Amino acid sequence: MAIERTLSIIKPDAVAKNVIGQIYSRFEGAGLKIVASRMAHLSRGDAEKFYAVHAARPFFKDLVDFMISGPVMIQVLEGEGAILKNRDLMGATDPKKAEKGTIRADFADSIDANAVHGSDAAETAAVEIAFFFPEMNVYSR
């Protein structure tokens, strides 16, 4: 399997619960390296641009409102099969359907406040990483 990079966001609900370290431990325990990381409080404009793919969906406004409701942790994860590995760690979008032991099953409250975001494909990951991290701010290790 190839070494990949994927974007991960710890959303405002999980940041407010003070579980950033527990989530980072899961990434690292699964063999993923954190090669870039920063905390940010997204502006409405940034959240709307980042989630533009969902602009026509009925949940778009609520998603943007949620993502700007508090700070988020944004990180780039690197490792073999990083995209799928991160998605497996996150669990199903709806925490009620997420497998026990996944990030969403353990830390999320609802399908809206679902603790984490992760890129769904290599193409998406490249676009999402570039959105938050200029290349010079991502470091292989």
Swiss-Prot record:
Keyword Ligase: no
GO CC terms: cytoplasm
Main localization (coarse): cytoplasm
Enzymatic class: transferase
Keywords: ATP-binding, Cytoplasm, Kinase, Magnesium, Metal-binding, Nucleotide metabolism, Nucleotide-binding, Phosphoprotein, Transferase
Active site: 117 (pros-phosphohistidine intermediate)
Gene Ontology molecular-function annotations: ATP binding; metal ion binding; nucleoside diphosphate kinase activity
Cell compartment(s), UniProt: Cytoplasm
GO biological process assignments: CTP biosynthetic process; GTP biosynthetic process; UTP biosynthetic process
Positions with a binding annotation for ATP: 11, 59, 87, 93, 104, 114
Top-rank taxon, per record: Bacteria
InterPro entries: NDK-like_dom, NDK-like_dom_sf, Nucleoside_diP_kinase
Enzyme nomenclature, EC number: 2.7.4.6
Pfam families from the UniProt entry: NDK
Database matches in HAMAP family: NDP_kinase
NCBIfam families xref list: PRK00668.1
Similarity remark: Belongs to the NDK family.
Free-text function comment from the UniProt entry: Major role in the synthesis of nucleoside triphosphates other than ATP. The ATP gamma phosphate is transferred to the NDP beta phosphate via a ping-pong mechanism, using a phosphorylated active-site intermediate.
Protein name: Nucleoside diphosphate kinase
Naturally occurring in which organism (per UniProt): Burkholderia ambifaria (strain MC40-6)
